[in-house]
């Protein structure tokens, strides 16, 4: 069965359909050696060769590809990029290896932010979840440094002007602390760059700690150590798909038994420790090379 080329490429995680349409129009995509044009349809077979900028890419039939989603506890210090030219650790380093697919990050967290980061094998799901029109809630626990009064909280709820347009927290709730070091839980329905930090800075308050604790109704899993991941079960995956009007999955790679749905904590901690040692050595080596 043939499908639109941009749909096949979006499913494989190479961008949204609109982004891929632009790539096709620019003549950057070839199918079996011929430059593709917008509107082309392809039938995914073992012999199909699709290239973007000359690089052969892997695609699968829709029926073959199971939508998988990971919840990852991103530590501070990791970059949301696949490869870093300086050799710094990235969020992709510790994810499980895949054959014939790849993990796609659902949004980004800046290098100094930790917490929940979702990954999926379904490019269309990732792009829809990230799109501002879907208004998927993101909740953050924020430790702030500075005087916070009712006037500032009111401004943050009603909206302040940032350099890229007006912004506001959907909800803001005090959650502990004393003096000028206080914790708040805030929610947003978009994912602009450093938006939480910039909102607080707009009212003269600095963020000293930032943790994403929820994406939609998916919380940061309890007991998951920093640098650890767990795969979402079928119900959670279909909840996310339903949020963005995608059809439900009918199968999952996650075992039914609860104790098999998550890597054991001690296994994850060993993996985290091992990765930290490797990353530490890599950074030391980088300093010596630059020094």
Swiss-Prot record:
Entry annotation: catalytic residues: 110
Keyword vocabulary terms for this entry: Isomerase, RNA-binding, rRNA processing
S4 RNA-binding domain residues: 3-63
Family per similarity comment: Belongs to the pseudouridine synthase RsuA family.
Source taxon at top rank: Bacteria
Identification of the protein by name: Ribosomal large subunit pseudouridine synthase B
Coiled coil: none
SUPFAM superfamilies: Alpha-L RNA-binding motif, Pseudouridine synthase
Lineage of origin: Bacteria, Pseudomonadati, Pseudomonadota, Gammaproteobacteria, Enterobacterales
SMART domains to which the protein is assigned, alphabetical: S4
Role of this protein: Responsible for synthesis of pseudouridine from uracil-2605 in 23S ribosomal RNA.
NCBIfam families for the chain: PRK10700.1, pseudouridine synthase
Pfam families linked: PseudoU_synth_2, S4
Catalysed reactions, semicolon-separated: uridine(2605) in 23S rRNA = pseudouridine(2605) in 23S rRNA
MF (Gene Ontology): 23S rRNA pseudouridine(2605) synthase activity; RNA binding
Transmembrane segments: none
Any GO BP annotation: enzyme-directed rRNA pseudouridine synthesis
UniProt xrefs under InterPro entries: PsdUridine_synth_cat_dom_sf, PsdUridine_synth_RsuA/RluA, PsdUridine_synth_RsuA/RluB/E/F, PsdUridine_synth_RsuA/RluB_CS, RsuA_PseudoU_synthase, S4_RNA-bd, S4_RNA-bd_sf
PANTHER family xrefs: PSEUDOURIDINE SYNTHASE FAMILY PROTEIN-RELATED (PTHR47683), RIBOSOMAL LARGE SUBUNIT PSEUDOURIDINE SYNTHASE B (PTHR47683:SF3)
Entry EC no(s): 5.4.99.22
């Amino acid at each position: 069965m043939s499908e639109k080329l941009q749909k096949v490429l979006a499913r494989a995680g190479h961008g949204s359909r609109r982004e891929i349409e632009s790539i096709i129009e620019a003549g950057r995509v070839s199918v079996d050696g011929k430059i593709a044009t917008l509107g082309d349809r392809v039938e995914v077979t073992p012999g199909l060769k699709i290239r973007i900028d000359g690089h052969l890419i892997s695609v699968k039939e829709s029926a073959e590809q199971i939508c998988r989603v990971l919840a990852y506890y991103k530590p501070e210090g990791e970059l949301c990029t696949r490869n870093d030219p300086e050799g710094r650790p990235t969020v992709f380093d510790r994810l499980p290896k895949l054959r014939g697919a790849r993990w796609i990050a659902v949004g980004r967290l800046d290098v100094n932010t930790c917490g929940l980061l979702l990954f999926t094998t379904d490019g269309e799901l990732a792009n829809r979840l990230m799109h501002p029109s879907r208004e998927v809630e993101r909740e953050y626990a924020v430790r702030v440094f500075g005087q916070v009064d009712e006037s500032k909280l009111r401004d943050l709820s009603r909206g302040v002007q940032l350099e890229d347009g007006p912004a506001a927290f959907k909800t803001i709730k005090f959650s502990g602390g004393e003096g000028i070091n206080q914790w708040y839980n805030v929610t947003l329905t978009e994912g602009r760059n450093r938006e939480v930090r910039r909102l607080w800075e707009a009212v003269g308050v600095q963020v000293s700690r930032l943790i994403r604790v929820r994406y939609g109704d998916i919380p940061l899993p309890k007991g998951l150590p920093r640098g650890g991941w767990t795969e979402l079960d079928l119900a959670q995956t279909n909840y996310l798909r339903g949020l963005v009007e995608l059809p439900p999955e009918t199968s999952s790679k996650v075992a039914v038994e609860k104790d098999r749905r998550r890597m054991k904590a001690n296994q994850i901690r060993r993996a985290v420790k091992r990765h930290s040692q490797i990353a530490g050595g890599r950074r030391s080596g980088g300093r010596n090379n630059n020094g």
